[in-house]
Amino acid sequence: MTNIRKTHPIMKIINHTFIDLPAPSNFSAWWNFGSLLGICLILQIMTGLFLAMHYTADTTSAFSSVTHICRDVNYGWMIRYMHANGASMFFICLFIHIGRGMYYGSYLLLETWNIGIILLFTTMATAFMGYVLPWGQMSFWGATVITNLLSAIPYIGTDLVQWIWGGFSVDKATLTRFFAFHFILPFMITALAMVHLLFLHETGSNNPTGINSDSDKIPFHPYYTMKDIMGFMMMFMTLLTLVLFSPDMLGDPDNYTPANPLNTPPHIKPEWYFLFAYAILRSIPNKLGGVLALVLSILILITLPMTHTAKQRSMMFRPMSQCMFWILVANLITLTWIGGQPVEPPFILIGQLASLSYFTIILIMMPLINLLENKLMKW
């Protein structure tokens, strides 16, 4: 009798995706993060569902309902902090996953890469709307500042902002629609992730060497399932340590003050995972210019396949490109730090220099160094 996993219509899909999938034999630990993102997504949907059971999307009771979850619901505090810090883990995995793609030239799988960029935008939108829901000071003012950026769009800007707000300021209508979108978007992310996997399995995975690995494949299960479980355990330990010992480490104390439209916090800033883009936004004195730079700081990922001038796919054997890559990582860490600092000297200048070097490294330095390496290797 033929094995059911190879004949049953649904089991067959699961089998070809997670069990009998031919995978390169030389995956490093950097290839763990795709599956970790899947686990993060499941965790966020589950904890989010339980939070939604007790949450009230109304300006008068949203803050109280979150307090009620933390005080009165059984393990409500844990569900809430798992969800909040789970988002941080999600973005850590996301940034490493993208960094891995940049380092090893995975962006040459065009469809997979482009769906990934759409996934990144959708995840950022979901996280932003989730941050508004507790209706604390930073929720309210973050929503006001970020949505207000759309008013920089010529001609339709002001109307667009008021249409998104559902009124003349961030209010009950805004909170209700943000809750609705925050609930539906993770399911869209799940669907997009499936398309992401579909396109990946059309071409097969890249590997650390960047060389075609058709001649040397191993089944995904048990080799990489075991390797992934190791990754899950490490991630869960990190997440639980964060949740149980310092759940508010990555949050903002201002969000424990109920939203007050009459009192502006001294420093309005988003969650840590948006700070690099926020720093780029603030480094340009012009409003429209800042908004464009903000969008381009993510959209720039689309240009990577076009600016890939190297003869080798991976950076594994290209020390100069490796050096440039780690300078880019250091640059992003600097931008993240600047995004959390007040707008005053010397932070303004550091932010402007870091923003300029971010775009320069990706658009100019990387392609030039690739060409130089080609020359040095006589290719």
From Swiss-Prot:
Superkingdom field: Eukaryota
Binding-site residues, heme b b566: H97, H196
Entry binding sites for a ubiquinone: H201
Subcellular location: Mitochondrion inner membrane
Gene3D superfamilies: Cytochrome Bc1 Complex, Chain C
Binding sites annotated in the UniProt record for heme b b562: H83, H182
Other facts noted in the record for this chain: Heme 1 (or BL or b562) is low-potential and absorbs at about 562 nm, and heme 2 (or BH or b566) is high-potential and absorbs at about 566 nm.
Protein name (record): Cytochrome b
